[in-house]
A protein has these predicted regions:
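Short His-Asn-centered micro-motif
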Residues: 5-7, 36-38, 110-111, 147-151, ...
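A donor-sugar binding/catalytic signature common to diverse glycosyltransferases
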Residues: 9, 15, 19-23, 185-218
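Secretory-pathway luminal glycosyltransferase catalytic domains
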Residues: 4, 38-142
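Active-site catalytic pocket residues across diverse enzymes, especially alpha/beta-hydrolases
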Residues: 25-28, 162, 214
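Catalytic donor nucleotide-activated moiety binding site of glycosyltransferases and closely related
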Residues: 110-116, 140-179
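Short catalytic/ligand-binding loop motif for oxyanion handling, primarily in non-cytosolic enzymes
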Residues: 13, 41-46, 116-119, 153-157, ...
């Protein structure tokens, strides 16, 4: 059997779809999964440029008209396990370099902003700057702080408050809808994943991805 899916949305949504379909239909079975991974404003890069191949999974940038797409969207079909996703060596080297610069002694937050604020507020799960300040002040001690965010102004707020704890400048703005590059986003995921402690943003699949990874990384 060949199953064809087209995950949509940002990197968190897409990896959620891929891993759930892989676990339910492909892993430990003689089946094949074809993933149509399109570049768009929500995800500005291709899976195969950043991650190791997954057994029995083929990633394509465009669909073959002769193939029927079995699913297109951002919903999972069962449990997810992001530990099956492995960054390519040159990406992993950058992650480890940053970890080493922090002596692998840091806490992290993911402050999701931009288009996320209104939906999270409507659901009553928006994580405010004050929520993050409280987490940081209670846990920072002598550790460094790593801030993952999709908004430069938000980064500056934390940088001004914790200037002695933050060692890295903000990512270069891509000037597009997705303000950070996919590589930067992937580095953020794993930096947060390896942190001693982590505070997530409510209603964020990106934060959910990190929390899932932390179960296997720590």
């Amino acid at each position: 059997m060949v199953l064809v899916i087209r995950p949509k949305g940002g990197i968190g949504n897409r990896l959620r779809v891929v891993t759930s379909y892989y676990l339910k239909y492909i892993k430990n079975k003689d089946e094949k999964l074809i993933v149509i991974w399109r570049w768009d404003k929500f995800c500005n890069g291709y899976f195969q440029e950043y991650f190791e191949p997954i057994p029995n999974v083929e990633f394509r940038t465009h669909n073959d008209p002769t193939l029927k797409i079995n699913y297109s969207g951002c919903s999972r079909v069962g449990p997810v396990d992001f530990s099956i996703i492995k960054p390519l060596p040159h990406i992993m080297n950058k992650i480890n370099e940053k970890r080493n610069l922090l002596n692998n002694d840091y806490i992290a937050i993911h402050a999701r902003r931009t288009d996320h604020i209104s939906p999270a507020e409507k659901r009553g799960v928006f994580t405010t700057d004050e929520d993050f300040f409280k987490f940081i002040d209670e846990n920072i001690n002598n550790s460094s702080l790593y801030v993952a965010t999709d908004n430069a102004d938000t980064y500056t707020i934390f940088q001004e408050r914790y200037k002695d704890k933050m060692k890295f400048p903000y990512h270069k703005d891509t000037g597009s809808y997705r303000k950070t590059s996919l590589e930067d986003a992937i580095i953020d995921i794993y930096m947060c994943g390896y942190a001693k402690k982590f505070k997530h943003s409510g209603w964020s699949t990106f934060s959910g991805l990190i929390n899932n990874l932390r179960k296997n990384l720590l």
